[in-house]
Curated annotation (Swiss-Prot):
It comes from Bacteroides fragilis (strain ATCC 25285 / DSM 2151 / CCUG 4856 / JCM 11019 / LMG 10263 / NCTC 9343 / Onslow / VPI 2553 / EN-2). The keyword Cell membrane does not apply. This is Methionyl-tRNA formyltransferase. It comes from the Bacteria. Disulfide bonds: none annotated. It is an enzyme of class 2 (transferase). It catalyses: L-methionyl-tRNA(fMet) + (6R)-10-formyltetrahydrofolate = N-formyl-L-methionyl-tRNA(fMet) + (6S)-5,6,7,8-tetrahydrofolate + H(+). Its EC number is 2.1.2.9. InterPro entries: Fmt, Formyl_trans_C, Formyl_transf_N, Formyl_transf_N_sf, Formyl_transferase-like_C_sf, Met-tRNA-FMT_C, Met-tRNA-FMT_N. (6S)-5,6,7,8-tetrahydrofolate binds at residues 113-116. The lineage of its organism: Bacteria, Pseudomonadati, Bacteroidota, Bacteroidia, Bacteroidales. One of its GO terms (cellular component) is cytosol. HAMAP family: Formyl_trans. Belongs to the Fmt family.
Amino acid sequence: MKKEDLRIVYMGTPDFAVEALQCLVEGGYNVVGVITMPDKPAGRGHKIQYSPVKQYALDHQLPLLQPEKLKDEEFIQALREWKADLQIVVAFRMLPEVVWNMPRLGTFNLHASLLPQYRGAAPINWAVINGDTETGITTFFLKHEIDTGEVIQQVRIPIADTDNVEIVHDKLMHLGGRLVIETVDAILEGKVKSIPQEEMAVAGELRPAPKIFKETCRIDWNQPVKRVYDFIRGLSPYPAAWSELVNPEGEAVVVKIFESEKLPKVHTLAPGSIVTDGKNFLRVAVPDGFVNVLSLQLPGKKRLKTDELLRGFHLTEAFKMKAV
């Protein structure tokens, strides 16, 4: 079968999913329809905002469906009418069997980890938070349990000690577009030899990648300096690690921290204690050193470098970060 004859339905929502869709369209593959999340109000004005995948589909006149419920009969019928040979899922939702089992060649997913590691909603964040030095991207066929299907292909990349989640996200996004094309071509050529995940070698224990909530992002200053440093970069710039900054009167505000340095050092200060000259630097004590805060954000303010913030905010060593 030629690629022009292979009927592909594509499912995805965020920017991460646009790259692979763009690679398919620009590569001359036959994308017969796109499925994305319903429109949602966003921002302070609650204006209706299209998902990045919807915007791309509209810009390129691709047929589009935005089901509220994936088991809805009208949606299922509309999907059947597209007569897909293959479905591709990138950063979308958990699909019911009636959807993923529909095409004759199956449905494959692009997942931003080296499966079976980091099954779940936030694999890039957790790989950085856990201080991993390597991650990657995987294509696999869908089955009942989430992120457990047979692996088709994988690509590995290093994680530098200075990478934050945005940098790793963008690297994987670009790699993912190419891997989707390679996977489609392998399926077209009948060269796929998928591997059950339980047969794949894994270094160390399996780690999950659960969805990240606000409380997940609270910094625990009782942790070692490297752990806190990795935690901050694993949540930067979004959704952002945060802590409560407590003034001498005991009043607290939430401060988001985006960039830091690790400064291992022996000291006797309590975790969360602040060391600052009030002008140029802000360091927070942890048991085995200090976290040097390089950029942060106060409520209702924009993100600033530490020295910029200190010029407009009178911070002394009588302040502290709530250790948790």
